[in-house]
Amino acid sequence: MFNRQTISSWLIAATLAFLPLSSQGQTEVSHHFAKNNGVKIHYVSAGDKNPGAPVIMIHGFPDYWYTWRKQIAVLAKTRHVLAIDLRGFNKSDKPKGVDNYAIPLLVEDVTAVLKQTGKKKAVICGHDWGGMVAWTFAMTHPELTEKLIVLNLPHPQGLTRELATNPQQQKNSAYAREFQKPGAHKKLTAEGLASWVTDAAAKEKYLEAFRRSDFEAMLNLYKKNYPRPPYELPKEAAKVKVACPVLLIHGLDDKALLAGALNDTWNWIESDLTLVTIPGAGHFVQQDAADLVTRSMASWLAR
């Protein structure tokens, strides 16, 4: 057990190598909808007969629930796993207006999904914007959060600090500033958004999902929530710390969210922090290093 002042940092952890897991296969999922104040949120479910707190998985941009397919295949053997489509994406509703994409509203979308399971707590897992939702969920709903898993989205305080002090992070965030411009969504195409997907069969699914999505709604995440210049240091320390154990996974080749933002994460967490950094994996670490990510999650959840 790690105390609040320590970190377990695995690069390519030899302790995971012997675990009898494989994330190569996929598993059948069922499709459902939860409603939050009139907004329907699509999610898939697998392993619903398994006991314990469910794992709710939240994707980022540009993505949809299918990004977790390899993790679902393993985790659903022992856990009830649910993977959502963020509002604006794929089969979820796409309300108009920037304000409808504020992070607190996305947090309540997750709450609606959890409520539908009938369980009192969940393991919240998020990547990219889903990571921002996950961090915020854990801080605002500690009573509903058993554990927290975040992939390639440093704590909001760390990201804000890096934007204010790290010229390279400022430069690498130019894409976000472009997304915040009026009409930016008109430059997007399904093909362009799916360009990062290397698996041919998966790319076809991504193209279908992005053609169902609303590009303007997707970019509203940036317009509403991403810091704008002039960037400033956090005005005060985080008032609310994460109370539950945290697994933080970061692909070190991520050019959008640099690893320097991970520094001092332990200052914002009251419980145990396990940090897994993966050289050679980029922003979409759950796909770039699928087996290692899946094994890390499974072994950590089994503690």
Predicted regions mapped to residue ranges:
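Active-site machinery of serine-nucleophile hydrolases
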Residues: 76-85
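Catalytic histidine-centered segment of alpha/beta-hydrolase-like enzymes
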Residues: 281-290, 294
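Serine-hydrolase catalytic-loop signature spanning alpha/beta hydrolases and amidase-signature enzymes
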Residues: 62-70, 81
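N-terminal signal peptide c-region/cleavage motif recognized by signal peptidases
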Residues: 20-22
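Structural cue for short, hydrophobic secondary-structure segments
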Residues: 57-60, 83
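Active-site glycine-rich loops that stabilize anionic/oxyanionic intermediates
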Residues: 60-63, 128
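Bacterial N-terminal signal peptides that target proteins for export
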Residues: 1-11
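Flexible "cap/lid" subdomain of the alpha/beta-hydrolase fold that forms the substrate-access gate
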Residues: 27-29, 38-41, 46-49, 54, ...
